[in-house]
């Protein structure tokens, strides 16, 4: 989840990569208003930190193809599936190249063999399309 957050931030603020894959991330820190990672202040105490740390707020800067993957039943309080859904809708609405894959019945960590195989297939297809031979 933190890796997904970092991927989204890197892609929004650089042109170093040909494509990205982000799984089960928290893209809008205002949806976790009572702290995240080492940030102990609430949203109301440090709104600019929450805004600036949120890839969602910088969706208009996304120029790199981004594959988003999320478990439909993710019950981690910082990474509910709406994080990926809203981020995807923002990216798509702004014309970014993106795809959202929701894994049925999966939580924050994916367990079903079918889900893992599908995840690997999606990632392979994405990398073949946007990275291979570039």
Please provide the spans of the model-predicted regions.
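Active-site-proximal cap/loop segments of hydrolase catalytic domains
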Residues: 1-134
